[in-house]
Amino acid sequence: MPDTTQIPNSFDMIIAGGDVIDGTGGPRRRADVGIIADRVAAVGDLSQAQAKERVDATGLAVAPGFIDVHTHDDRMVLTQPAVAPKSSQGVTTVVTGNCGVSLAPFVPGSRAGEANPPGPMALLGTWDDYKYPTLADYNEALEASPPAINVASLVGHSTLRAGVMDGFERPATKAEIDAMARVLEQSLKGGAVGLSTGLAYPTAIHAPTDEIVELAACLKDFGALYTTHMRNEGPDLVPSVDETIEIADRSGAATVISHHKCVGRENWGKSHDSLAHIKAAQQRMKLDYDVYPYTATSTILLKDFLSTSEKTVLTSSATHPEMVGREFDSIVAEWGCSVDEAIDRLSPAGAVYFRMDEDEVRRIMAFPGAMIASDGLPIDEGRPHPRLWGTFPRVLGHYCRDHGVFSLEEAVHRMSGKPASVFGIKDRGEIRQGAFADLVVFDP
């Protein structure tokens, strides 16, 4: 790390003349940013300093690299080291292992006899991709083929369940919870930043609150987080928020609600109550949430999600790739079959569900401290939801510049300094002397 007691007069690179938005939420300022090796060595007037490379940023914004706190990039960071969907939009750090599914820790062969990973685990690939018995094994694979961006890993609750249970249609036994806790603690010692759940999915829907509390209780001593795709985001949105608050209360774990939203026309407006409950809970605990800037969701093809969707478009299908891009209703009509049969024939499959309200997205996004995240699905290679490639530019353009949901400084803070603080990502998320030089330069 550069010596912070003095300003050098020679740098590897100087980004000159830009409007520095430092990630703290404070006002922008015209300044140069000097870089030595992988760290910011100086911020200020460096017009007289020497540099091996000087980048003219006049008229541009210079910000910390964005941190995408909710991704499913577990496999992409290994197989596509450029990580183009993220690096192309200024993301320099991703948090993997969300919604209860992570590639590690999982002992290969634990689900012998099952052709495909169950439910949401298929979002990360096939059984061949679940080949990392420990988080250390996964990290070694990252080190062997380093991606262009940084990776912080959550441990998926459904992945833990898949490793110790013979089926998902019941609560875990005490012995199974103890086994999961041991694996979780091993992963936390190995650098995992927390535990995630996907309580709306078949792999975890039968997991009671007590099961989650027992596992989340492991987190506090490690300074790790509990993140959750809640049990319901429609008619039972508010009870699901209350369950999340109960888990945080009883476990003592700092908690993040993933992709907070209200789905289904009949449920629009419920964020008034959900946000009120969150605000009240924040007075006594560390509780945050993230949000993505679209009115459509995307995940595996599930009947329960179809019921709250105005329109559903297929994004992937292992068995019928020719149907990708088609509306689900048109596929059912063409095949002359039931909804259940169509799902069975298309699965494993993914879909985009149009089921949110624009005004509500803005309300949730505008809430103080809400973080920005993509929830993109790299496995949908043919017709992915645009959030995979476009989340951060859309927030900066559509919501910040065009609609004034918040200032540019606040937008950058919610994409950088705030998530770095919440997830304990040190020396990233801010432009200051001594911080890593993860930077993005863009036209505001």
What kind of feature is each model-predicted range?
Residues 61-85:
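Di-metal (Zn2+ and/or Mg2+/Mn2+) metal-binding site signature of metallo-dependent hydrolases
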